[in-house]
Amino acid sequence: MYHVPEMRLHYPLVNTQSNAAITPTRSYDNTLPSFNELSHQSTINLPFVQRETPNAYANVAQLATSPTQAKSGYYCRYYAVPFPTYPQQPQSPYQQAVLPYATIPNSNFQPSSFPVMAVMPPEVQFDGSFLNTLHPHTELPPIIQNTNDTSVARPNNLKSIAAASPTVTATTRTPGVSSTSVLKPRVITTMWEDENTICYQVEANGISVVRRADNNMINGTKLLNVTKMTRGRRDGILRSEKVREVVKIGSMHLKGVWIPFERAYILAQREQILDHLYPLFVKDIESIVDARKPSNKASLTPKSSPAPIKQEPSDNKHEIATEIKPKSIDALSNGASTQGAGELPHLKINHIDTEAQTSRAKNELS
């Protein structure tokens, strides 16, 4: 092959994998460079050799082959340059990671080497905080019968979602605030003097929803206001209720259309605000209110109070130090031998306080 300094090599513009050979319109000679109409440069004609293998790029005739040694009598102006073969690189950890949302079944899909998702060790589990039970599209729990069912019915959605997706291990333990700890009982008990009944008030989205204790009716107007719906739609829903009571006198949280407990539960479940109003729809709501009340403090407080400190003027300063020492300190000092080693610093602090009081009394008398 002749060396031409001005020669430029081009990639083929023809389909090299096709069986049909391209016959030139005129015969070319391989002795001198000829003019190329496409590139407007002087190029040299190289023999194009067809192989029986389907991949023509991998099996291209050697460039040093003369036209007389070529097996084919056709000449092509362009030739194919084979791409260099690189050794197969080992898969990165990102390629070995199983992505649940990118897995295509029954296909040869290979994940790219782009770091889409960090590889987590198998002992690390998801805390389940992203499974928010207050999401509007989650399943709503059934009506809670008593307080013992609250610990069972609340994480119902977490179990159903975790069962549907086995790749995600949803647990109730969270490092910070879990999704179930947000739902704390926040009931306010008020007295409705006009109706002579107790009302249970729960706030959601800045609106107080009230439930009566005598007949368990709920203020439907405030209930639907939690959903932020329009006034026309709210009045249309309440107007279609067969059993309702209209209250026009009283506080703002008492005014409105009152509907039965069962109908209010259905509306709250349909509008997906049932979890926001917990524990308003607990049937035994009195037990939750009673559980929040402080226990009897009389059983926790000691029956005998320590004797008051006496300070009487006297000439003897040593007698003052013995009088201002409380009896409780004497009892603790006498029983110090029976206490554990962990309580000794507490007794030492009491003695330091007693010495400070003694020195203060001496300074006042002097």
Curated annotation (Swiss-Prot):
Residues 294-366 are annotated as: Disordered. GO terms for biological process: positive regulation of pseudohyphal growth; positive regulation of transcription by RNA polymerase II. Residues 312-328 have a biased composition (Basic and acidic residues). Its main location: nucleus. Signal peptide: none annotated. One of its GO terms (cellular component) is nucleus. Residues 220-241 bind DNA. PROSITE patterns: HTH_APSES (PS51299). It comes from the Eukaryota. The keyword DNA-binding applies. Residues 186-292 form the HTH APSES-type domain. The keyword Nucleus applies. Keywords: DNA-binding, Nucleus, Transcription, Transcription regulation. It is found in: Nucleus. SUPFAM superfamilies: DNA-binding domain of Mlu1-box binding protein MBP1 (SSF54616). Present with 1420 molecules/cell in log phase SD medium. Putative transcription factor that functions in pseudohyphal growth. Belongs to the EFG1/PHD1/stuA family. This is Putative transcription factor PHD1. The lineage of its organism: Eukaryota, Fungi, Dikarya, Ascomycota, Saccharomycotina.
